[in-house]
Amino acid sequence: MGFKRYVEIGRVALVNYGEDHGKLVVIVDVVDQNRALVDAPDMERIQMNFKRLSLTDIVIDINRVPKKKALIEAMEKADVKNKWEKSSWGRKLIVQKRRANLNDFDRFKIMLAKIKKAGVVRQELAKLKKEITA
């Protein structure tokens, strides 16, 4: 199995750190071996170092350095947001954000639910063991 996420025009990437942390951006041009020109509907087009980007599996069909309107249309046509939210990586980040926003009482309720679930699983396992040995 080879590497499939290449730096290419139209590749959607996730920003790892910095002021745009967590945003999905599209590579619209490659400046040199270390930097790319990236753009997104809710931000200005900027140069970004490849070390700040994590390439995703999503690729949209765009020309080199498209206008903002063309980029937005291409992203909507490719359904980038839904593809990202349905991917395991996107779901994991959504869960992390949701957990980070929990307050103490919410964490307490989750702890009680986990204890209750573990108790039910333990009871069912004991029933199955009893059936096997009987």
UniProtKB/Swiss-Prot annotation:
Signal peptide: none annotated. GO terms for molecular function: mRNA binding; structural constituent of ribosome. The keyword Ribonucleoprotein applies. Keywords: Ribonucleoprotein, Ribosomal protein. SUPFAM superfamilies: Translation proteins SH3-like domain. Transmembrane segments: none annotated. GO terms for biological process: translation. GO terms for cellular component: cytosol; cytosolic large ribosomal subunit; cytosolic ribosome; endoplasmic reticulum; nucleolus; plant-type vacuole; plasmodesma; vacuole. Coiled coil: none annotated. InterPro entries: Rib_uL2_dom2, Ribosomal_eL14, Ribosomal_eL14_dom, Translation_prot_SH3-like_sf. It holds the Pfam family Ribosomal_L14e. Belongs to the eukaryotic ribosomal protein eL14 family. This is Large ribosomal subunit protein eL14y. The gene is RPL14B.
